[in-house]
A protein has these predicted regions:
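Acidic-leaning, charged glycine-interspersed low-complexity segments
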Residues: 105-185
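Secondary-structure boundary elements
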Residues: 17, 124, 189-191
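Amphipathic alpha-helical interaction segments
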Residues: 12, 19, 115, 185-186
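Protruding loop/beta-arch "assembly-hinge" segments enriched in small, turn-prone residues
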Residues: 187-200
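Oligomerization/assembly interface segments of phage tail-like spikes and tubes
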Residues: 70-86, 172-190
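Extracellular/virion structural assembly segments
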Residues: 2, 67-73, 80-129
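Small/polar-rich, solvent-exposed N-terminal microdomains that initiate assembly or binding
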Residues: 1-69, 134-139, 143-156
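Intrinsic-disorder/low-complexity loop/linker signature
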Residues: 9, 24, 88, 97-101, ...
């Protein structure tokens, strides 16, 4: 089973702006949620949450790919959340609220593009691993992530349709938090045979 959430959490750990602590003892910046609008862990703790942070929707959104009946198309929903800086008003400096709001939106956009660049490299490295072209000891963070993945997960990465990724910001939510939603399609092979081991 392809667990994209685990790959995204690994990225959140090595990506400096997030610096997620996977053990939950320090800075938590990665969340597994149903939807951004539901009462989830981030929403319950937004006043204490570290900024920036990200969330992955664990809801399954899939369909049979029309162009290829042997494939399934999955749609992955990822959210980047950035808290808008509080405006500062004093005799020397007046920070326009619209400026801090724009900064938050563009910061989320920058993180989306950083993730897509990372996933592009991850796809290339997993393709090398699948083809047996990664014979050296893993050196980079990307090589270490790919080498730790089972073959099925490496194949799942190759199905990510990054060129068709779509993203955009939502109106402000949760007391000065801005959300940028990212949608990525993944094409996976469909089971064509009944697995007899799953039946009596």
């Amino acid at each position: 089973m392809f667990r994209f959430d685990n790959i995204l959490e690994a990225w959140a750990c090595i990506y400096k702006p997030l610096s997620h602590d996977i053990n939950g003892h320090g800075r938590k910046t990665f969340y597994r949620i149903d939807t951004i609008n539901n009462n989830n862990e981030f929403v319950q703790n937004y006043n204490l949450a570290a900024t920036p942070c990200m969330a992955y929707s664990t809801l399954v959104d899939a369909s049979r790919a029309r162009a290829n009946a042997k494939s399934i198309s999955y749609r992955h929903s990822i959210y980047f959340m950035v808290k808008q800086a509080a405006p500062q008003h004093n005799a020397k400096t007046v920070v326009n609220d619209a400026d801090t709001e724009t900064d938050a939106k563009y910061y989320a956009d920058e993180m989306v593009q950083d993730l897509l660049a990372f996933l592009d490299e991850l796809k290339k490295e997993s393709q090398r691993a699948i083809n047996g072209n990664s014979t050296h000891q893993p050196q980079t963070a990307i090589e270490r992530i790919v080498s730790a993945l089972p073959k099925e997960e490496q194949m799942g990465i190759n199905g990510l349709q990054l060129d068709g990724a779509e993203w955009g910001t939502f109106p402000m939510k949760y007391n000065r938090w801005w959300v940028c939603g990212l949608e990525i399609e993944q094409i996976s092979p469909r089971l064509l045979c009944v697995n007899g081991e799953k039946y009596y």
